[in-house]
Amino acid sequence: MAQSLALALDVPETTGDEGLEPSPYEESEVHDSFHQLIQEQSLRVAEEGLELLPLGLGRGDQTLPGLEGAPALSSATLRILASMPSRTIGRSRGAIISQYYNRTVRLRRRSSRPLLGNVVPSARPSLRLYDLELDSTILEEDEKRSLLVKELQGLSAAQRDHMVRNMPLSLGEKRCLREKSWSPKGKRRHLQGRSGAFSCCSRLRYTCMLALHSLGLALLSGLYAARPWRYALKQIGGQFGSSVLSYFLFLKTLLAFNALMLLPLLAFLVGVQAAFPPDPAGPVPTFSGLELLTGGGRFTHTVMYYGYYSNSTLSPSCDAPREGGQCSPRLGSLPYNMPLAYLFTMGATFFLTCIILVYSMSHSFGESYRVGSTKGIHALTVFCSWDYKVTQKRASRVQQDSICTQLKELLAEWHLRKRPRSVCGQLRQVVVLGLGWLLCLGSTMGCTVAVLTFSEVMIQRPASGGQGVEALALPLVVSVLNLGASYLFRGLATLERHDSPVLEVYMAICRNLILKMAVLGVLCYHWLGRRVATLQGQCWEDFVGQELYRFMVVDFIFMLLDSLFGELVWRLISEKKLKRGQKPEFDIARNVLDLIYGQTLTWLGVLFSPLLPAVQILRLLFLFHIKKASLMANCQAPRRPWLASHMSTVFLTLLCFPSFLGAAVFLCYAVWQVRPSSTCGPFRTLNTMYEAGTVWVRRLEHAGSGASWLPWLHHFLVENTFFLFLASALLLAVIYFNIQVVKGQRKVICLLKEQIRNEGEDKIFLINKLHSVYEEEGRSRPGRTQDATEPPAWHEDGGDQKEPCNPRSP
């Protein structure tokens, strides 16, 4: 066997570039000496290149089509490829220790302390900073370790810990290096810690710290376990796919929105009014249980509704009310003004909700519309999706189902692109879609006219104050029409036979959205345009709040009935009578629109019932568990799986623009234009609710208190329309800049992918050149006769074409 030789590169190091990595120009001498290195490497044992040799095929194996055109590389080329840095990373601890020894030398040579972020945890040996050893017997590993330990002892504690932490070694090696590099003082401190030589105060301090840390971990684990979606979301995503999972994720988002809305209402309105309850105007009715359906009765005399809140300042002692029903402020103090608190709390709550909603929508847009290459995505899903930290059998089963469902969705999407529809089929599809839309719009118009007619009939009847069962008539009619129209739309979608299940869901969402928004528009006109005029001398705000409460309760009951009869009964009929193994599918469009409809009712009624977000939270929690149980027991996974990559963005967009924007317009009209009731509520003595802020500013100007800047702030920020336009422009600018940032990130991703592709082509070119050089040397050697045939080129798989990277395509 030939003796292994060592090549020492004598490249002088100047003082000007100490601590810096060599540039490509400075390493030209190193690259020029590669020819000598290749000649010496050719003398090594041939077994080092065995790992790149193709394995022999077994008896029953078949030749893969991709291996027929594989290049026949020589043994020398295989040995060179086997010694490449990318194939030797992590093999030689001596090389790693030698590399970090040179790094510590550079750290000590620097005049100033370096930035820790500049240290790259690479395992490739440097060709410039130490001798290139090809034989491990030249420098022993122990000698390298001792040199590294000496250099580590000369570093500061922070630099030493950071250097050892980033070494690509095992934990035992790192622990050994850290212990050997300790100073004598550090060793004594470590021995004292292990022997327990601590004072009583130190022991008490450490015990308290450990107890607090354990308590915090226990509280966090308890909060994590108390979440209803802790395990259910993974189970749903694994069994039913991302399309059904998007519904439950949207429900979780609505829970967060209502919780954020409820907190300021409880802190500044409900809690304060409950601490200072007003005197009852008459006898308070007893609780009968019917209030849970109608929202009237005993609930009318609680903090549930607008009429219970007082129109005076809340304090333990208050002077007689002056003009506008307000108490005069005492010297040097500003009492709690309930009308002002009611108005500003509602405004701040809606403004905060708007900001969070717009941010969530933009963030979801950036997450879902990122650049994703479909080339090799199936292989990545198969080989790179498993989480090896999962050890429990139940969790591993869920992860297995999730990967299987994800593969089905990817294959279904790929198969859909490979099967375009013919021209005749497209014309037929357009005609069927046109007829379907005409029927949907006609049914929507019919439902709207029916709701308007029935609401006029209800106006002609005497108002019952929301205490009888007859008050549930209008919510029942609206819920029946919504449910019947949704089933009609679903039947039309079945007849239309869409090629894409995503398009089918989007069509159903648009049709249900048009229906529900039209019905809600008629109801808003009924409440503010008709009911206010007929309820003169009564508290119309309480009536509107009770109506919205009844709509939420009846809608919740119909959702339960739909889960019971629409899913459970249909499953029993399909399995018992029809003898089919198929179960009904989960209707994503109708269930999502039910959530948006319920959230719109909450936003419409929060001004007249401050505790309506709490009712919505309870409603969503019940819906989560009921829908999950019904889904697991009565539904099956979609027969045509599809990847819901943009569904969260679509849901948040629909929640923002038609739902939240419409509710904001409704409430702004109620605050600025409609006269409040003169018998109840915090604005009973005012012409509009907005005048509460004007009256408060006027009182501050007359009082001449130290808060004289508040009237100026109210004038320029509230009454001046320029600030409103400026805030709207800033919000639109933030949305625009966020969209541009997302587009820029997608373009950068495209450029990086193109750069990676070019680097791969460069490496293929160099390998081909290296193979050609060895073939020429083999032919030129004496004593060998070989046909002068050109070696085959190392190439990529010819079946895959370069996929164009288009950053504008979602």
From Swiss-Prot:
Organism: Mus musculus (Mouse)
The protein's assembly and partners: Interacts with TMC8. Interacts and forms a complex with TMC8 and CIB1; the interaction stabilizes each component of the complex. Interacts and forms a complex with TMC8 and SLC30A1/ZNT1; the interaction regulates zinc transport into the ER.
Residue ranges, compositional bias (Basic and acidic residues): 793-810
Residues that bear Phosphoserine: S136
Principal cellular location given in the protein's record: endoplasmic reticulum
Stretches with biased composition (Acidic residues): 15-26
Signal peptide: none
Lumenal domain ranges by topology: 1-205, 275-338, 451-468, 526-552, 625-649, 743-810
One of the Pfam families matching this protein, by short name: TMC
Tissue expression pattern: Widely expressed. Highly expressed in thymus, lung and spleen. Expressed in lymphocytes and peripheral lymphocytes. Expressed in small and medium dorsal root ganglion (DRG) neurons.
Record: glycosylation sites: N102, N311
Subcellular location: Endoplasmic reticulum membrane
One Gene Ontology CC term in the entry: plasma membrane
Annotated protein name in UniProt: Transmembrane channel-like protein 6
Modified residues (Phosphothreonine): T88, T104
Membrane topology annotation: Multi-pass membrane protein
Family membership: Belongs to the TMC family.
Residue numbers on the Cytoplasmic membrane side: 227-253, 360-429, 490-504, 574-603, 671-721
UniProt function note: Acts as a regulatory protein involved in the regulation of numerous cellular processes. Together with its homolog TMC8/EVER2, forms a complex with calcium-binding protein CIB1 in lymphocytes and keratynocytes where TMC6 and TMC8 stabilize CIB1 and reciprocally. Together with TMC8, also forms a complex with and activates zinc transporter ZNT1 at the ER membrane of keratynocytes, thereby facilitating zinc uptake into the ER. Down-regulates the activity of transcription factors induced by zinc and cytokines.
Keywords: Endoplasmic reticulum, Glycoprotein, Membrane, Methylation, Phosphoprotein, Transmembrane, Transmembrane helix
Residues spanning the membrane: 206-226, 254-274, 339-359, 430-450, 469-489, 505-525, 553-573, 604-624, 650-670, 722-742
Region listing for Disordered, in residue ranges: 1-26, 775-810
Residue numbers bearing the Omega-N-methylarginine modification: R93
Effect of gene knockout: Knocktout mice breed and grow normally. No major defect in T cell subset numbers or function. Decrease in CIB1 protein level in thymocytes and lymph node cells. In knocktout mice, heat and mechanical hyperalgesia in chronic pain are alleviated. In knocktout mice, DRG neurons exhibit a hyperpolarized resting membrane potential compared with WT neurons. Small to medium DRG neurons show reduced excitability compared with WT neurons.
GO process annotations (BP): intracellular zinc ion homeostasis; protein stabilization
